[in-house]
Swiss-Prot record:
It comes from Gallus gallus. It comes from the Eukaryota. Keywords: Chromosome, DNA-binding, Nucleus. One of its GO terms (cellular component) is nucleosome. Histones H1 are necessary for the condensation of nucleosome chains into higher-order structures. Belongs to the histone H1/H5 family. PROSITE patterns: H15. Pfam families: Linker_histone. This is Histone H1.03. The keyword DNA-binding applies. Residues 40-113 form the H15 domain. It is found in: Nucleus; Chromosome. Residues 1-43, 99-224 are annotated as: Disordered. Its main location: nucleus.
Amino acid sequence: MAETAPVAAPDVAAAPTPAKAAPAKKPKKAAGGAKARKPAGPSVTELITKAVSASKERKGLSLAALKKALAAGGYDVEKSNSRIKLGLKSLVSKGTLVQTKGTGASGSFRLSKKSGDVKEKAPKKKTPAAKPKKPAAKKPAAAAKKPKKAVAVKKSPKKAKKPAAAATKKAAKSPKKVTKAAKPKKAVAVKSPAKAKAVKPKAAKPKATKPKAAKAKKAAPKKK
């Protein structure tokens, strides 16, 4: 009897596990049902706007003609009659449709001028999107011109070499001017002793007069 009691315990513990697995499968079915509803097709308002825009009547498309156009497109008009009326009212309130005759959902409808202008402006907005592509094409051209400027910078060091060569030529010519300036100094040194020699013989002339006076004195005693 003691051995049968522990065998029943694992059976009770295993029972709740399938109960937990069952709720995990339910959300998967709900997700599958949501996916199946999406490919139902366009909404009622989209079908109504297409049918009204396709009509060429100036006074507008009547409700009976609208139902015929929707039925021709494969839409079940009898089951979704209330949806058609609600769609017409919402489009009129938004301003996409204008009711030319009748009141409420009955009467005739046509597209408003504002909705037509919006459709015409929509393709015009696409053209500005193509304009930014042109500056993108000009950027590589500008990048190609930049290396040309770098070539012009390389030429500048060549000009710097010419002044260096000119400086060396001037440095070589400068010692010649120094030698020319030294020559007049030697000429001045030669002329100064020549003047001193010319002065000395003039001072020696008075010495020659002295012997003449002596001779006169010697001749005087002879007369006695």
